[in-house]
């Protein structure tokens, strides 16, 4: 008889091992066997929980996305209610510690690349993109006309992605302070122009 709660513990253990494997070996070097080895379990158990490598990557990205969405919610709730503060909260969530560790950043890069070829991952990316744009647009709409709010949201989303991508590819820890300053300056510029 399986232990109560063991399924979630085991899944979390395997997702962590997947993040570490992608960090160390990249997506091509990440196999069910490499994940099993890092988790000190059999390959059969990995297959039991995730089916195949695609299922494992999907579950790992769902985990990373949940962390992002949790950080976004937590920071928006804690922020003052004015649009500037709430926009800054959304930006900060994208540079949250849960999103800028080397294993997570490399997994994001692998996910983006793979999402161009995998319909399920493409759908996850589409949901994430829409959620970011919606959060930004809702806040900009409190201070700008609708069309300007949409344009501002698209611009800030592109800036977030660009700053994050440059940071991920820089070869060292991401300078979140510099990224946040640039994004905050952009928000201030957009809100001051109205």
From Swiss-Prot:
GO MF entries: DNA-binding transcription factor activity; transcription cis-regulatory region binding
Keyword Aminoacyl-tRNA synthetase: no
GO biological process: glycine betaine biosynthetic process from choline; negative regulation of DNA-templated transcription
Highest taxon of the lineage: Bacteria
Binding region for DNA: 31-50
Alphabetic keyword roster: DNA-binding, Repressor, Transcription, Transcription regulation
Residues in HTH tetR-type domain copies: 8-68
Keyword Kinase tagged: no
Metabolic or biological pathway, per its Swiss-Prot or TrEMBL entry: Amine and polyamine biosynthesis; betaine biosynthesis via choline pathway [regulation]
Biological function: Repressor involved in the biosynthesis of the osmoprotectant glycine betaine. It represses transcription of the choline transporter BetT and the genes of BetAB involved in the synthesis of glycine betaine.
Protein's name in the database: HTH-type transcriptional regulator BetI
Lineage: Bacteria, Pseudomonadati, Pseudomonadota, Betaproteobacteria, Burkholderiales
């Amino acid at each position: 008889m399986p232990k109560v709660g063991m399924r979630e513990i085991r899944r979390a253990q395997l997702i962590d091992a997947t993040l570490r494997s992608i960090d160390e070996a990249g997506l091509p070097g990440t196999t069910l066997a490499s994940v099993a080895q890092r988790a000190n379990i059999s390959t059969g158990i990995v297959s039991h929980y995730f089916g195949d490598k695609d299922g494992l990557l999907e579950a790992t990205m769902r985990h990373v996305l949940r962390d992002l969405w949790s950080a976004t919610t937590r920071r928006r709730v804690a922020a003052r209610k004015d649009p500037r503060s709430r926009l800054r909260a959304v930006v900060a969530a994208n540079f949250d510690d849960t999103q800028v560790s080397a294993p997570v950043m490399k997994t994001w890069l692998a996910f983006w690349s793979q999402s161009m070829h995998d319909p399920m991952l493409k759908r996850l990316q589409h949901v994430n993109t829409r959620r970011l744009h919606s959060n930004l647009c809702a806040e900009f709409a409190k201070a700008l006309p609708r069309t300007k709010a949409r344009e501002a949201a698209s611009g800030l989303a592109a800036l977030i992605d660009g700053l994050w991508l440059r940071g991920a590819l820089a070869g060292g820890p991401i300078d979140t302070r510099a990224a946040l300053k640039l994004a905050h300056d952009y928000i201030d510029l957009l809100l001051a122009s109205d």
